[in-house]
Amino acid sequence: MSHQSDLISEDILAYLGQHERKELLRFLTCGNVDDGKSTLIGRLLHDSKMIYEDHLEAITRDSKKVGTTGDDVDLALLVDGLQAEREQGITIDVAYRYFSTAKRKFIIADTPGHEQYTRNMATGASTCDLAIILIDARYGVQTQTRRHSFIASLLGIRHIVVAINKMDLKDFDQGVFEQIKADYLAFAEKIGLKTSSLHFVPMSALKGDNVVNKSERSPWYAGQSLMEILETVEIAADRNLDDMRFPVQYVNRPNLNFRGFAGTLASGVVRKGDEVVALPSGKGSKVKSIVTFEGELEQAGPGQAVTLTLEDEIDVSRGDMLVHADNRPLVTDGFDAMLVWMAEEPMLPGKKYDIKRATSYVPGSIPSIVHKVDVNTLERTPGSELKLNEIARVKVSLDAPIALDGYEQNRTTGAFIVIDRLTNGTVGAGMIVSAPPAAHGSSAHHGSNAHVTREERAGRFGQQPATVLFSGLSGAGKSTLAYAVERKLFDMGRAVYVLDGQNLRHDLNKGLPQDRAGRTENWLRTAHVAKQFNEAGLISLCAFVAPSAEGREQARALIGAERLITVYVQASPQVCRERDPQGLYAAGEDNIPGESFPYDVPLDADLVIDTQALSVEDGVKQVLDLLRERQAI
């Protein structure tokens, strides 16, 4: 099968070592319907000897049944795997294939050419270094050509190969090639593609001309074959080595003596002893060690998954970003972005969504559409909603600030996805364009315009603001415990208030369903209120089922890890059913937490109170002790 089969049979370890050192190039193929994308990939695999013999025999048989190439083997069948694709002779979903040569490793994304699958193309392009845009020599630059070129430009793909395919049907006429090249260059100038990043290749994917080997049928073409371009295009310089960005994926605490922050370095280089700050908090420290499974490193670069330990015990949580102290990104809760809408349900300005950028997960909304972009004509038009496959420049507003870069500067920290809060489906993909300069360094809406500082409020109330979430099954005793803690704190002269999940369903959260998604949304909406109470200096006590671990993590990002305390109020389902304070179990409802739908036990809870084993008074004492430990009271 492989060009290196001899080395594999002689010395497998040498082969694996050589293979590991190869540079990886991710590229995608796109173009109009039936331009030959899947055939091109099949040809690349076939001519680079990356097809197993039994696989080749299988597609030879299939070619006679569903092939479109007459007596020839239909190499497109190597990639068109869905039954609907083979029946219709088109590509519907993004198909990924892997192959390698002596010089490089490759991952190919074969993207669909139809307009209704623009979102699939955007998905395939998001991680690619290079795009191959196929043009049928018979038709020249088409609407889909312009659309895919615009999306490739939008998604920051820096290298584009314009493959003018089916030149055999035009007898490899140089005039046809030059005319299509001129037409494409005129369009490329409009969308800002640099001519230095463009390569034009006349080819026949079906016959193999100029795909892997140079063709004798185009003696006038002095350039490289497609494979030569793929093997030699310079992508190492595309990596950002200047701006150190380390999104924290999780806090690694295997034992009491180790606390590290795990993640993948998005860009830049980090070394032992580097001064870093955690954003958005702005707290600083130095890198103590860079830990991997194989041992410690002196430095790490883009794409490496490592665990960083710091000299100081500063508060760093999932979603935070570690950066060099002298090279900080913007910290803001608002920015402009180019957004590709990927859902059947239209995007409505002002609707609440979850915005996921790298490891941060923050509630937010899209207040307005600046303009929609017609990807066929590049015309800008106003809009009040965004439909499936439409692209627009929008304004994004977050409920909590995050650290971010522009997409051109950093494709990881400058990109985000939009998630529907009820279905958890990805509905949009965005590229950050800019952020308001005034937002730099902001940490919340409440700040520069406030006349009363947080310190003054803390001094007046004699406490530090905090939110305590009492989470557990229905009937576990959450509300009972929350109100008892409120009574005790109030008698101590503290400013405190209970936000009860059931009470809020009569007003703020009226109409929300009682299922898992509805109960998660019930808590997330209230988390905004709790945050505002904290801004006012109060202690918020929240009694909610909050069944979703993901929803609780989102609330932590919103309120702040240093302010949110999670108390798991524990009781067995049988005891909860016997207590049944709201009559939920007796009514035979089909929305019972832990029975009708899963309840994610808070494994990382700050405190666990077993209401079967402890009295209310004992539970109150444990909560107060924890508040004192956190220096809230």
UniProtKB/Swiss-Prot annotation:
InterPro entries in the record, alphabetically? APS_kinase, CysN_GTP-bd, CysN_II, CysN_NoDQ_III, G_TR_CS, GTP-eEF1A_C, P-loop_NTPase, Small_GTP-bd
Positions of the UniProt region annotated as G1: 31-38
Q: Which reaction does it catalyse?
A: sulfate + ATP + H(+) = adenosine 5'-phosphosulfate + diphosphate; adenosine 5'-phosphosulfate + ATP = 3'-phosphoadenylyl sulfate + ADP + H(+)
Gene Ontology BP annotations: cellular response to sulfate starvation; hydrogen sulfide biosynthetic process; sulfate assimilation; sulfur compound metabolic process
Q: What is its EC number?
A: 2.7.7.4, 2.7.1.25
Residue positions annotated to bind GTP are: 31-38, 110-114, 165-168
Q: Which family does it belong to?
A: In the C-terminal section; belongs to the APS kinase family. In the N-terminal section; belongs to the TRAFAC class translation factor GTPase superfamily. Classic translation factor GTPase family. CysN/NodQ subfamily.
Pathway listed: Sulfur metabolism; hydrogen sulfide biosynthesis; sulfite from sulfate: step 1/3; Sulfur metabolism; hydrogen sulfide biosynthesis; sulfite from sulfate: step 2/3
> Which major enzyme category is it?
transferase
Entry GO MF terms: adenylylsulfate kinase activity; ATP binding; GTP binding; GTPase activity; sulfate adenylyltransferase (ATP) activity
The scientific name of the source species is Pseudomonas aeruginosa (strain ATCC 15692 / DSM 22644 / CIP 104116 / JCM 14847 / LMG 12228 / 1C / PRS 101 / PAO1)
Residue ranges annotated for the tr-type G domain, each copy included: 22-241
Q: What is this protein called?
A: Bifunctional enzyme CysN/CysC
Q: How does it assemble?
A: Heterodimer composed of CysD, the smaller subunit, and CysNC.
Cited function: With CysD forms the ATP sulfurylase (ATPS) that catalyzes the adenylation of sulfate producing adenosine 5'-phosphosulfate (APS) and diphosphate, the first enzymatic step in sulfur assimilation pathway. APS synthesis involves the formation of a high-energy phosphoric-sulfuric acid anhydride bond driven by GTP hydrolysis by CysN coupled to ATP hydrolysis by CysD.
